[in-house]
Amino acid sequence: MMNVHPVKGPVATGGERPHEADHPTSLVASFGADQPLRLDCGVDLAPFQIAYQTYGTLNADKSNAILVCHALTMDQHIANVHPITGKPGGWLTLVGPGKPIDTDRYFVICSNVIGSCMGSTGPASTNPATGKVWGLDFPVITIPDMVRAQAMLVDRLGIDKLFCVVGGSMGGMQVLQWSVAYPERVFSAMPIACATRHSAQNIAFHELGRQAVMADPDWAHGRYVETGAHPHRGLAVARMAAHITYLSDAALHRKFGRRMQDRELPTFSFDADFQVESYLRYQGSSFVERFDANSYLYLTRAMDYFDIAADHHGVLAAAFRGTQTRFCVVSFTSDWLFPTPESRAIVHALNAGGARVSFAEVETDKGHDAFLLDEPEFIDIARAFLHSAATARGLDKAGR
């Protein structure tokens, strides 16, 4: 049996972010010039590295591995203290001892996606050919590129077939891509709050964020690391705009309403008079301490390009035809970023392709981010699906 634990290290500050890009506080799988990653844009990326975390114990026949695919601005630190923020892991509602993704039962892997900034090769990494940060010289990547890199990592770990692939939002897109690109390697899959392609509205929101970043003079055409001035203002605005889409009108009303921030009367200025304004400003300012602006451009573009049906003559069901993977598709009633009809389209395509699929629409007012929050119905659904799949896979409560 192989027992692998996450690497622990000191909590970093925002100023150490470039160090995480090349030398992450994580496990690292390095791939040399003889193991290139073929990208959809036609470039062979080599050498490159993947930063990842693992939790739990891989059983003797390597049949209890779960791959968790993270969302856009998350990373591999889903169940351990984050090395930059010092905050708890990003998905502790779902991952950990006794949780639905039970680390006492399963061997859990989460890798930082290619193109991000927490240790996997991306625009914030050093280009070995120049000795400088890649910046916009880094090739444009796609969701399939991310999944191919993950498959290389899974190969490196000696795992032929994953018990389950789980993820929400951009992570859910990766789950769907895994099930299409490597159906024989995925026993079960749980795509959450996602779609098989990005809508025009979501592309528009992403373009708004990208333009905010690129309009910041400190962006310097992507060469801000060389100038020493980072486009924090533009990236903060991008984060503020995106964060609104992760919530719902009901959630904002319940949490903030029109309540004032530390005052009883308006200031008749452009200060943050309302609590919701102060909250958004905090979301923007805290985000820039842990995320790279160019990575934000690259990952949002990857989501925009995602379209499973495009590679199957526009017929989505053809992508899933003959799959033996067991699916559980989950949506949330107040999610207007990836509304329930998007999930129903996935279910219809899976049904047409002859797949085994269950579907759950969770009643909640928490919006898109509900999949990351303490949402009891969703947690119960995840637990039940994984337990059922584990029984079908022949895994006992100890993951053997």
Swiss-Prot record:
One of its GO terms (molecular function) is homoserine O-acetyltransferase activity. It comes from the Bacteria. It catalyses: L-homoserine + acetyl-CoA = O-acetyl-L-homoserine + CoA. InterPro entries: AB_hydrolase_1, AB_hydrolase_fold, HAT_MetX-like. It is an enzyme of class 2 (transferase). Substrate binds at residues 239, 369. It holds the Pfam family Abhydrolase_1. The keyword Amino-acid biosynthesis applies. Residues 64-374 form the AB hydrolase-1 domain. Transfers an acetyl group from acetyl-CoA to L-homoserine, forming acetyl-L-homoserine. This is Homoserine O-acetyltransferase. It comes from Rhodopseudomonas palustris (strain HaA2). The lineage of its organism: Bacteria, Pseudomonadati, Pseudomonadota, Alphaproteobacteria, Hyphomicrobiales.
